[in-house]
């Protein structure tokens, strides 16, 4: 898998390897039957869990770790980190390996008792603080303010505006802290081509059609201008924003290789698969 990762430092590769192996053991220990009973879409994840939960997502974590260690906090001074809605603590595990004090927040009850207990035990064993809270509806009063707040690939799953959530995260970010936000780019190159050809840029319709309500897949992905609007509405000031490709398997096929070769020739901006924004609290 290393040859499909984004380029980064040896330090980041090392902690990603450690975190990936720890999460592999955690995944192997979890009984997914309760999740599958609640939502049949989890069956494909259970059947190939390491691929879907780690290998498919690893570049998102590499990207964030690389930014933190080389640009945002190279001297390791912003030591308190909180990840909101992380589900499986892959990135938090890697951050603890780098010496950060990491808190994770998610409503693990939604994934079933077996999953919740497994993750709580894992956190106890790996120096992670965990709060089992609904990030939309529960109070964050018990959470300490953090130097770095993180929200990756979460808001696209919401069935409404993310403004309330981002406001809550802003209130738990120190005045001199930073917020790292990531969301799929609805206007990426492949999705623009799909739309031109008459195909939907959204999730497979059969998955959506046969899923229980509310749908737990991607309800609303975003554009770069929409991310800017969201950050401004939540009193964050964007310091850096970019799009990037995170799927390590998208260039394995000949079609994927062709698209990768073609994209640099397109005279348009913001064609990457994901949008990453780094923001500060507005003074």
Where are these regions (language model features)?
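S-adenosyl-L-methionine-dependent methyltransferase catalytic module, highlighting the catalytic core
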Residues: 47-51, 55-59, 114, 121-122, ...
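Conserved N-terminal segment of class I S-adenosyl-L-methionine
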Residues: 1-148, 152, 163-166, 243-246, ...
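Short catalytic micro-motifs in class I SAM-dependent methyltransferases
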Residues: 153-157
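Short alpha-helical scaffold segments that flank and stabilize functional sites
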Residues: 67, 95, 176, 282-283
